[in-house]
């Protein structure tokens, strides 16, 4: 946090954190105007934002908070509150996390499968399905569905 590269430019400055009801948390990087959203156990789920004048970009973000699935960002330069709604992909991830936070692995599995239909390399969705299969005592019957790299530790 707050490190510099060889030229003296700041690599990142993590200035604010918000926590959602389901345990997700968002971290604001004020140098690059990016927001990183993590699961309650610290796995990066997705990121968004960036510097600029276009829609979805920020100039001088100073604060963030959750409002349901939306992330609100206070931008000092624009003197505004920018509202970011999740994409369909982000919505599915949020729903999977929310169901998992209630230990409803049956419901979460449906969301994780939809996430994998969009991005079959999303590690956390594979873990979520693994929790579902484990909960259902079907690991031996379904272990062939998990990619090998996720089975070795």
Predicted regions and their residues:
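Structural marker of alpha-solenoid helical repeat scaffolds
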Residues: 118, 151-152
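Hydrophobic/aromatic packing residues within the alpha-helices of TPR/SEL1-like helical repeat arrays
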Residues: 112, 146-147
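Eukaryotic scaffold repeat domains enriched in small/polar residues
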Residues: 1-133
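Heptad-repeat amphipathic alpha-helical coiled-coil interaction surface used
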Residues: 129, 149-150
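Short coil/turn linking the two alpha-helices of tandem helical-hairpin repeats
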Residues: 135-137
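Alpha-helical positions within canonical tetratricopeptide repeat
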Residues: 107, 140-142
